[in-house]
Curated annotation (Swiss-Prot):
Organism of derivation: Ralstonia nicotianae (strain ATCC BAA-1114 / GMI1000)
Pathway(s) served: Amine and polyamine biosynthesis; spermidine biosynthesis; spermidine from putrescine: step 1/1
Main location: membrane
Binding-site residues for spermidine, renumbered to this chain: H289, D313
Job of this protein: Catalyzes the irreversible transfer of a propylamine group from the amino donor S-adenosylmethioninamine (decarboxy-AdoMet) to putrescine (1,4-diaminobutane) to yield spermidine.
Alphabetical keyword list: Cell membrane, Membrane, Plasmid, Polyamine biosynthesis, Spermidine biosynthesis, Transferase, Transmembrane, Transmembrane helix
Classification via PANTHER family: THERMOSPERMINE SYNTHASE ACAULIS5
Protein's recorded name: Polyamine aminopropyltransferase 1
Entry's EC annotation: 2.5.1.16
Any Pfam family: Spermine_synth
Active site, per annotation: D385 (proton acceptor)
Cellular compartments annotated: Cell membrane
Membrane-protein topology: Multi-pass membrane protein
Segments for region (Spermidine synthase): 222-471
């Protein structure tokens, strides 16, 4: 008996045709959509719940586990029903995946809603459905393909290429330009398009009556129409959810590659939120920014060159520019959308008193750490006004290496001042910043101020060189909050704000991020 050639052992009875190539191309689309839903869920959870590392890790873990379940469940789909079930599957993936971001945004605005439960339920459902896609496509191709090894290599190649495409497009184009809600609907439409194409191209192979094919086409049309309507209404849906979340009129809402910026207004109160977290209220921000800026500039009386890291709203700039001896201010903020908004929006420009139009100001849109590594400039005062250290990407800007790098750009007689969270609500976070500065070689003078929007808020003055500091008793510029008595009180801590034992924040442990999460979890639970 002759031995068959090796390829014959790996063959199926159907010949190769053009439909196979189109199915392989469909793999590219469904892989892109599958990863997109995972990224949308992770980004949305990070935006709404904070702690991006935890949220992305848990979302990815749950999603991959659900995909594994879906792959196992796919074995129960009968061979003669593969095409029909694939069409149904794509419609379900498109529907659940497409509406996921909009549904979660709207749900989060309802205080009593079980947001986390619904989030992980949606992730699980979408993951199971996505996990079934590739096994079904491979089985369809195997019934039509001559060589199984070639089939596997082609399917996985296009699977990985689709994942690569969306992993690049999502952070660079889709999320910042379309937003999470519209991006979700877009990929839902892609899944629906695959369902419609399969239904039309393989209509003769479905093994269904004309009536059943018509019913499937009707379902596809309904899903597509719903997703198109959602895509068209994405901005309105996002506006409704954010209006319900923040409670006030939204006058600006911008998605950048780095963050979501929302500015609200209620009567004369303007508020800025970054990723859902309050950054200032115009009713009391002067307290925060006077406390942040003025003690340092009063102490370094000859300060001519000032560095601002963060502070893209221009409110710290407004305080600095009160001093006529200041000749140059360099502001380094990562997000150009932030500095552009506060340079051009009429109400916000009025709030920062046209600070960005002052010829003494230079704006650099760059990562602060990378800029410090390449810049050669020296400064008399450095104002560090970063967001709170709620994740590792921001936590590195509060680390020992970062403060050592910053010290190279501060004159020997210069001072650094840092916003350092709340010594009352987040004592370990606050004193961790102080310990980190000392570990980096600074002498420190911690202080705090009451900002009604935030509560008791903390700052730390620090000297990398031989500069000394005494709380000022007078101010050379107009103030609304600070005077001699207020300043003296700021540098005194009440017994209910004791200093706990903490370790410095290093890059290899990021202890500050852990302290911050634990401190605020205890306050907000």
């Amino acid at each position: 008996m002759p031995t068959p050639p090796p390829d014959a052992l790996d063959a199926s009875p159907q010949p190769v045709n053009r439909g196979n190539a189109l199915l392989v191309l469909a793999v590219f689309v469904v892989a892109s959509c599958g990863l997109a839903y995972e990224l949308i869920a992770g980004a949305l959870a990070s935006y709404l719940l904070g702690d991006s590392i935890l949220q992305f890790s848990s979302i990815i873990g749950a999603y991959l586990f659900a995909m594994g379940i879906g792959s196992w469940v796919s074995r129960y789909v009968a061979d003669d029903a593969l095409l029909a079930r694939f069409v149904d599957l794509e419609l379900l993936v498109g529907l659940f995946g497409g509406v996921s971001a909009a549904a979660l945004f709207l749900l989060f605005a309802l205080e009593s809603a079980p947001f986390r439960l619904v989030l992980y339920a949606l992730v699980t459902v979408i993951g199971v459905l996505v996990g079934m896609e590739i096994p079904l496509v491979m089985r369809m191709l195997h019934r039509r393909q001559a060589k199984f090894s070639d089939l596997v290599s082609r399917v996985l190649t296009f699977d990985y290429l689709g994942a690569l495409a969306v992993s690049l497009l999502f952070p660079l184009v889709l999320a910042p330009r379309l937003g999470l809600v519209r991006t979700g609907f877009l990929f839902g439409l892609c899944n629906t398009a695959i369902a419609v194409w399969t239904l039309w191209h393989f209509r003769a192979e479905l093994g269904l009556s004309a009536r059943l094919r018509g019913a499937m086409a009707w379902r596809a049309g309904m899903v597509g129409a719903a997703l198109l309507a959602g895509f068209a209404a994405s901005d309105r849906l996002t506006h409704w959810s954010e209006r319900a979340l923040f409670g006030d009129e939204i006058i600006h809402a911008i998605s950048s590659p780095y963050q979501r910026l929302v500015v609200t207004r209620w009567k004369d109160d303007l508020r800025l939120y970054i990723n859902g977290n309050l950054q200032f209220s115009s009713r009391d921000e002067y307290r925060y920014h006077e406390a942040l800026v003025l003690p340092a500039l009063e102490s370094v009386r000859g300060a001519r060159r000032v560095l601002v890291l963060g502070g893209g709203d221009g409110l710290a700039l407004r305080q600095i520019l009160k001093y006529p001896q200041v000749e140059h201010v360099t502001l380094v903020d990562l997000d150009p959308r932030m500095t552009s908004l506060f340079s051009h929006a009429e109400a916000l420009v009025a709030l920062n008193q046209h600070a960005f139009s002052d010829p003494r100001v230079t704006v650099v849109n760059a990562d602060a750490g990378q800029w410090l590594q390449t810049a050669a400039d020296m400064f008399d005062v450095a104002i560090v006004d970063f967001p709170d250290p709620s994740n590792f990407s921001i936590g590195k800007l509060y680390s020992v290496p970062f403060y050592r790098l910053l010290s190279r750009h501060v004159a020997d007689t210069g001072l650094v001042v840092i916003q350092a969270t709340s010594p009352y609500f987040a004592p370990r976070s606050y004193w961790c910043v102080d310990a980190t500065l000392k570990e980096a070689g600074y002498r420190t003078w911690p202080y705090h101020a009451l900002v009604p929007s935030f509560g008791e808020w903390g700052f730390i003055l620090a000297a990398p060189g031989r500069a000394d500091f005494r709380p000022p008793t007078t101010y050379r510029v107009p103030t609304r909050f600070l005077d001699a008595d207020t300043t003296h009180q700021m540098f005194s801590f009440a017994p209910d704000m004791p200093r706990p034992q903490v370790e410095p924040n290093r890059l290899n442990n990021q202890s500050l991020v852990r302290y911050f999460e634990e401190d605020w979890h205890g306050v907000l639970r």
